[in-house]
């Protein structure tokens, strides 16, 4: 997870407590919330469930 966090930061994403705008990401345990700049809604990656979930 640390490698992914470092990579996202290098790509210009900003770590925050709450993902509210494009370019934000947040980490809580094995869950990564990410708002890609080219998407209308953020996504959630649950590394324990091994699935990608869009959320609004």
Q: Whereabouts are the PLM-identified features?
A:
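ASCE RecA-like P-loop NTPase motor cores
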Residues: 1-56
């Amino acid at each position: 997870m640390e490698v992914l966090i470092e990579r996202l930061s290098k790509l210009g994403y900003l770590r925050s407590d709450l993902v509210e705008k494009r370019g934000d990401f947040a980490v809580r345990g094995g869950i990564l919330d990410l708002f890609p700049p080219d998407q209308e809604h953020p996504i959630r990656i649950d590394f324990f469930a091994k699935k990608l979930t869009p959320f609004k």
